[in-house]
């Protein structure tokens, strides 16, 4: 059995108290939470597709005569299997059907709807996620990558003006709608920017939303002070500003608010008979000690004084023209921020604002509550804002209010004032509390919102143009509107990627990737250093090691092993709760925001036998700092040393001894390892190998306890045991009585042309438990990831051949196929119906020898098992020429001699240059319908098969129903309308039970009331009936699908009548030029392959397999490879495998101890002898076993040389690159080299006849063929391009041939 073989000696000192989650959970959960396909209609949550559809409906026309409402949605089963879709170039999808209700009436003012029509409407097809977390789109396996983007909510930041003054800003970022930014300037005022357009003062916005008077705005910020007019106060009041208008009742003279009080004005106010006045508070007498002068300065500079003036200012600044009237300006502002259709903060945006401004909201509610006048005004504004919003909360701002409110705007200004006073902190935009993940479900929801908005617009137009004639929902809905948006997302989005399938690790990493790029994200050019850098909040959430090396460095990351994404899109990581120094077993999932200001300690700190921290002080982590704190101050402890890195980095043993840059390369290069002919798991592993193999779905595992009943190379059958009830199987109605068949993948081509093949690990009669590995993949061994080979290595120079990281290999690795890999190439030919006639696959090709056709079958397709080389025919095909009409004489000759050669031309598909291999599989698909009789017979056969299936199902249902209910007394069985169908007291006999099997009864029975008094029996009967309904529908769907396939023939992409696919397998041995690497970033190219007898050998005559340059270790600082080398040698000698988890593995002393146990030198060095001379090398050499990978950078795919080939249309210079059969660029520096040597003739040739002198190169070719002298070069085409560009600038350039 597999388990015995994979046991490893474990060096870990710390055991994790929880298992890491399923590594594909991030993809699978997100998609299934979006579509909720397995959730009953009544229990569907308001999320994903359900929420999108609820938001898109109801739709009404402008006259108010029609109302289209949404009820529910459902999916059909996929028409084809995953394999069929890949083979035929189709999309693995399901059809979405939505139940809609259309109501209409004759007049808008009628209270009731005249008639309602309920109908299920087809809304298009949605790509469906496979159980591996991928999508099949047009036959290609794709992955939707999660996006890390700026979280909706409010973000506070600061900038420094050139004069040294700090300026603060607050941005409110919604999920959908206009961005609003509040910004202080150097003159101590607050401006508002909406969508980064022109700015206006914040007081104008406050007036526009309802705080019309200066006094109202000042009162909001507690800036109004009532001062009695005594002579003693004269000095205090002079220089202050009036908060409200002063009216002299006798003269009618008005001293307006904002007027600075002078001696003169003071006297005027006294004469007007005022006992006290309201003034704006000055900072000096503000009892709270907070300078709010920024509001006063803003008011004093505000040109508006009324709500109407403010509305005009806001409208003019944003629309760049005058408002037609005040109502238009008011409705524009309401639409921009207070309308749910146009503005949506989203659940996350509202949550973030409430969390960030919690204290400001509390202060605001408390302050407004104490001022009756202000409370009344605030309530009026709130009522106006929320009148269109259905709210369920008693708070002024509940979680369900997803538009902006006046409270949000005022609280943001409160916080800005605190920032100005140094009493608050700005946000860190790179903090993971301010960045969230949009996984596949959310991205799909966004596409549906776009598609349904377009569909809604079309429906409104149709409803508006309709008269009172009857219409049904299906007349209004065009399915293409929605499905075209979803299809274009999968085909063209930057986040929908062609899956990297080189090996299982590459596949899984692609699915766990988190990208900051994509729509609504960053761009490579704009992203600075800070956003790419590792942040302290990445701890346990995003891997600090695994990221690409190129321009995307830091923008694309991988989720850490234990990381999960919560329902709000924030990344969480688990911690153990620590209570007063006591480490508990309670595990909590913390987001970056939850963890902020908490003190956490690593899992490696010493604990006593009672799980208390055994030392008084510990080095802990809080924010980005590492202070030494008392054990009693610790809040949380890590759950595992592995939790900070991703799965790929966790596979690198002794990672703790490697430099970060090399660890990055090691993690990335494991993803490029090609599966080899035979796979070896590493002798020195980390314990993650089995987890990655299982979670990537590369291996097949048992679903529960059972027994293997049949094993072949193509399938494994397991009979699972009964469950806990001892009478319920995996499915009560399972016809196979718990028997499950697992089909094995055989020689399947991956997206990267590597080979995927599974082989069984179990035998007939083997007992299996849950998660027992049943079958291995091409990249696993006994259920563990196996990407490379364990080979004997020596670190030494060898005659200069391993200079600059080159690798020297033994010929044994070639002969024994140690690093041989299989690559499968797919070639596709299709038949189209062209204007000139239909193309045809055939063996009958004119002017082609019988020798060339020897391997083709009667359809013109190469036979399986044939060995082919370049230019061999794979698929014979002819296509019509479409020549001019033949003369009568030609027609007669053709009729007599049957010469068809001039009608058609050979369009056969050949093996491309440089390729040879064996044909392992061919497929032919045809759209053409079979003849009528054939179809009729097939459909009759299908009907018989499915009728038998259904009969069998009903028989099993009756058997189980009898088992549960026979002889028991009914408590009353009701239908869904409350009508009794089996009266209370009825004994369940065969005649009564027969009712249950009828379709009408099963559809209408109300299961919630129960059928008998026993709860257990009711539970079993309910489960049985639900299962029966489901399986019955399953059979009906399957029958329809099979009939469709028979009627339609093979479904193919549009325009294609027939499709032929040919698969060529190549065995590629390791050769000079191939790239290899270890797991520590120790990469190199094979420089020389030596005969075994020339390799350095040990004293016992054992030659080494591979020689690496020792100079590649010290400067790279990846010492982990030396630890691995020595421990690997000990493992091979002892015949065991080791498990050394990262940060928790073998120490230097333990490696020495294992070497000693194996009878090897403890320093890991031995004397080696030169294979060529037999002499001993002067110094001892580090020798051992290292795990080496062959990477998918093979020299066969890269080597290329051009003779003549295609040229660029504009410059007429040869194209570049292997794909274009291009040449090597002869660039500026190469020109300098020829100039330096004075090689004038070669230089002239390079720049003219060998490049873009079109006339010259043709003449040169002619001269070479005829054996004549070469002609004089002409003018290069690039010179003509330069001339034309100058002419385009208006400069006339003429070439004067007469100049001597």
From Swiss-Prot:
PROSITE patterns the record matches: RNA_POL_BETA (PS01166)
Reaction(s) this enzyme catalyzes, per UniProt: RNA(n) + a ribonucleoside 5'-triphosphate = RNA(n+1) + diphosphate
Keywords carried by this UniProt record: DNA-directed RNA polymerase, Nucleotidyltransferase, Transcription, Transferase
Pfam families the record matches: RNA_pol_Rpb2_1, RNA_pol_Rpb2_2, RNA_pol_Rpb2_3, RNA_pol_Rpb2_45, RNA_pol_Rpb2_6, RNA_pol_Rpb2_7
EC identifiers of the protein: 2.7.7.6
UniProt keyword Transcription, yes or no: yes
GO cellular component, one term: DNA-directed RNA polymerase complex
Transmembrane helix is among the record's keywords: no
InterPro entries given in the database record: DNA-dir_RNA_pol_bsu_ext_1_sf (IPR042107), DNA-dir_RNA_pol_bsu_external_1 (IPR019462), DNA-dir_RNA_pol_su2 (IPR015712), DNA-dir_RNAP_su2_dom (IPR007120), DNA-dir_RNAP_su2_hyb_sf (IPR037033), RNA_pol_bsu_bac (IPR010243), RNA_pol_bsu_CS (IPR007121), RNA_pol_bsu_protrusion (IPR007644)
Tree of life domain: Bacteria
Gene Ontology MF annotations: DNA binding; DNA-directed RNA polymerase activity; ribonucleoside binding
GO biological process: DNA-templated transcription
NCBIfam families associated with the record: PRK00405.1, rpoB
Record family assignment: Belongs to the RNA polymerase beta chain family.
Function of the molecule: DNA-dependent RNA polymerase catalyzes the transcription of DNA into RNA using the four ribonucleoside triphosphates as substrates.
Subunit (UniProt): The RNAP catalytic core consists of 2 alpha, 1 beta, 1 beta' and 1 omega subunit. When a sigma factor is associated with the core the holoenzyme is formed, which can initiate transcription.
Protein name per Swiss-Prot or TrEMBL: DNA-directed RNA polymerase subunit beta
Organism (species): Chlorobium chlorochromatii (strain CaD3)
């Amino acid at each position: 059995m597999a388990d015995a073989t994979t046991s490893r000696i474990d060096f870990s000192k710390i055991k994790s108290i929880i298992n890491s989650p399923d590594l594909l959970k991030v993809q699978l959960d997100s998609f299934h939470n979006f579509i909720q396909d397995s959730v009953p209609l009544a229990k569907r949550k308001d999320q994903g597709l359900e929420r999108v559809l609820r938001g898109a409906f109801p739709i009404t026309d402008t006259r108010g005569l029609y109302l289209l409402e949404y009820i529910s949605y459902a999916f059909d089963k996929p028409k084809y299997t995953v394999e069929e879709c890949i083979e035929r170039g189709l999309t693995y999808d399901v059809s979405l059907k939505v139940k809609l209700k259309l109501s209409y009436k004759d007049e808008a003012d009628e209270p009731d709807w005249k008639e309602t029509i309920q109908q299920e409407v087809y809304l298009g097809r949605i790509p469906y996620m496979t159980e591996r977390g991928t999508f099949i789109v047009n036959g290609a396996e794709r992955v939707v990558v999660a996006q890390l983007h700026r979280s909706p909510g409010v973000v506070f930041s600061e900038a420094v003006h050139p004069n040294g003054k700090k300026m603060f800003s607050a941005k409110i970022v919604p999920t959908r709608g206009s961005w609003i930014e509040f910004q202080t300037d150097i003159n101590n005022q607050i401006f508002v920017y909406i969508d980064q357009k022109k700015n206006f003062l914040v007081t104008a916005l406050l007036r526009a939303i309802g705080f019309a008077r200066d006094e109202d705005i000042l009162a909001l910020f507690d800036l109004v002070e009532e001062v009695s007019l005594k002579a003693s106060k004269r000095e205090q009041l002079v220089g202050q500003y009036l908060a409200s208008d002063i009216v002299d009742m006798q003269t009618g003279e008005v001293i307006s608010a904002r007027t600075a009080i002078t001696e003169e004005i003071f006297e005027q106010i006294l004469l007007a008979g005022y006992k006290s006045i309201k003034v704006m508070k000055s900072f000096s007498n503000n009892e709270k000690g907070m300078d709010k002068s920024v509001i006063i300065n803003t008011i004093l500079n505000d040109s508006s004084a009324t709500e109407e003036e403010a509305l005009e200012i806001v409208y003019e600044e944003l629309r760049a023209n005058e408002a037609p009237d005040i109502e238009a300006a008011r409705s524009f502002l309401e639409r921009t921020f207070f309308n749910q259709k146009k503005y949506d903060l989203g659940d996350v945006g509202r949550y973030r604002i409430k969390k960030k401004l919690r204290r400001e909201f509390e202060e605001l509610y408390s302050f407004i509550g104490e001022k009756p006048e202000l409370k009344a005004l605030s309530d009026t504004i709130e009522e106006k804002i929320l009148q269109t919003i259905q709210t369920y909360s008693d708070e002024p701002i509940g979680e369900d209010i997803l538009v902006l409110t006046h409270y949000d705007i005022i609280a943001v200004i409160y916080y800005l004032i605190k920032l100005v006073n140094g009493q608050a902190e700005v946000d860190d935009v790179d903090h993971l509390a301010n960045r969230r993940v949009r996984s596949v479900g959310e991205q799909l929801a966004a596409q549906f919102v776009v598609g349904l908005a377009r569909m809604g617009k079309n429906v409104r137009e149709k409803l508006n143009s309709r008269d009172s004639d009857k219409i049904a929902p299906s007349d209004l809905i065009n399915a293409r509107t929605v499905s075209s948006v979803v299809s274009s997302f999968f085909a063209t989005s930057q986040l929908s990627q062609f899956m990297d399938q080189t090996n299982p690790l590459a596949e899984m990493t692609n699915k766990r990737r988190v990208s900051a790029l994509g729509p609504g994200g960053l761009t490579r050019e704009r992203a600075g250093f800070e956003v790419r850098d590792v942040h302290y909040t990445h701890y346990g959430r995003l891997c600090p090691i695994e990221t690409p090396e190129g321009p995307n460095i830091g923008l694309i990351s991988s989720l850490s092993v234990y990381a999960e994404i919560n329902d709000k899109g924030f990344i969480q990581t688990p911690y153990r709760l620590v209570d007063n120094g006591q480490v508990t077993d309670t595990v909590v999932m913390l987001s970056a925001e939850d963890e902020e200001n908490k003190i956490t300690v690593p899992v490696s700190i010493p604990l006593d036998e009672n799980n208390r921290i055994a030392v008084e002080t510990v080095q802990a982590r809080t924010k980005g700092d590492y202070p030494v704190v008392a054990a009693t101050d610790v809040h949380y402890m890590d759950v595992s040393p592995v939790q900070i890195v991703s799965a790929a980095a966790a596979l690198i043993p002794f990672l703790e001894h490697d430099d970060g840059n090399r660890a990055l390369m090691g993690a990335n290069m494991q993803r490029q390892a090609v599966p080899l002919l035979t796979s070896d798991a590493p002798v020195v592993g980390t314990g993650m190998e089995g987890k990655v193999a299982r979670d990537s779905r590369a291996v097949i595992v048992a679903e529960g306890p059972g027994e293997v009943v049949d094993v072949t190379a193509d399938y494994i059958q397991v009979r699972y045991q009964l469950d806990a009830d001892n009478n319920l199987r995996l499915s009560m109605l399972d016809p196979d009585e718990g028997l499950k068949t697992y089909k094995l993948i055989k020689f399947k081509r991956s997206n990267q042309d590597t080979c995927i093949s599974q082989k069984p690990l179990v035998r007939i009669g083997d007992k299996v438990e849950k998660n027992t590995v049943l079958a291995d993949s091409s990249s696993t061994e006994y259920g563990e990831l196996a990407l490379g080979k364990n080979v004997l290595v020596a670190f030494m120079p060898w005659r200069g051949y391993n200079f600059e990281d080159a690798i020297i290999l033994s010929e044994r690795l070639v002969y024994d196929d140690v690093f041989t890999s299989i690559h499968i190439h797919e070639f596709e030919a299709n038949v189209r119906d062209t204007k000139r006639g239909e193309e045809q696959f055939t063996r009958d090709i004119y002017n082609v020898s019988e020798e060339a056709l020897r391997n083709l079958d009667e359809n013109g397709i190469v036979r399986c098992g044939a060995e082919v080389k370049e230019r061999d025919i794979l698929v014979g095909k002819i296509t019509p020429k479409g020549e001019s009409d033949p003369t009568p004489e030609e027609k007669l000759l053709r009729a007599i001699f049957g010469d068809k050669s001039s009608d058609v031309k050979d369009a056969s598909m050949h093996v491309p240059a440089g390729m040879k291999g064996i044909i392992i599989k061919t497929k032919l698909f045809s759209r053409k319908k079979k003849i009528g009789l054939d179809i009729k017979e097939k459909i009759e056969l299908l009907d018989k098969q499915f009728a038998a299936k259904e009969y069998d199902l009903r028989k099993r249902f009756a058997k189980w129903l009898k088992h549960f209910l026979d002889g028991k007394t009914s408590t009353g069985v009701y239908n869904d309308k409350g009508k009794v169908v089996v009266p209370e007291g009825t004994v369940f006999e065969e005649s009564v039970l027969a009712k249950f099997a009828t379709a009408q009864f099963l559809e209408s029975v109300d299961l919630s009331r129960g059928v008998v008094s026993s709860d257990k029996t009711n539970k079993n009967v309910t489960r049985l009936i639900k299962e029966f309904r489901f399986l019955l529908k399953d059979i009906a769907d399957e029958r329809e699908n099979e009939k469709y396939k028979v009627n339609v023939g093979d479904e193919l992409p549009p325009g294609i009548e027939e499709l032929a696919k040919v698969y060529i397998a190549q065995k590629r041995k390791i050769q000079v030029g191939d790239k290899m690497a270890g797991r520590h970033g120790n990469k190199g190219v094979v420089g020389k392959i030596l005969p075994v007898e020339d390799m350095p050998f040990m004293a016992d005559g054992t030659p080494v397999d591979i020689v690496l340059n020792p100079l590649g270790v010290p400067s790279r600082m990846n010492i982990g490879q030396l630890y691995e080398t020595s421990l690997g040698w000990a493992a091979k000698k002892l015949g065991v495998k080791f498990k050394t988890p990262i940060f928790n593995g073998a120490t230097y002393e333990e490696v020495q101890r294992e070497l000693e146990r194996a009878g090897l030198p403890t320093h890991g060095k031995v004397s080696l002898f030169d294979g060529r001379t037999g002499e001993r090398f002067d110094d001892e050499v580090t020798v051992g076993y290292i795990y080496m990978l062959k990477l998918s950078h093979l020299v066969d795919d890269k080597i290329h040389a051009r003779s003549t080939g295609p040229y660029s249309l504009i410059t007429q210079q040869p194209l570049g690159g292997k794909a274009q059969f291009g040449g090597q660029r002869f660039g500026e520096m190469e020109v300098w080299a020829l100039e330096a040597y004075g090689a004038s003739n070669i230089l002239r040739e390079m720049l003219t006849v060998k490049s873009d002198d079109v006339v010259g190169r043709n003449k040169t070719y002619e001269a070479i063929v005829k054996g004549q002298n070469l002609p004089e070069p002409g003018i290069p085409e690039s010179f003509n391009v330069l001339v034309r560009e100058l002419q385009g600038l208006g400069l006339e350039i003429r070439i004067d041939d007469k100049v001597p």
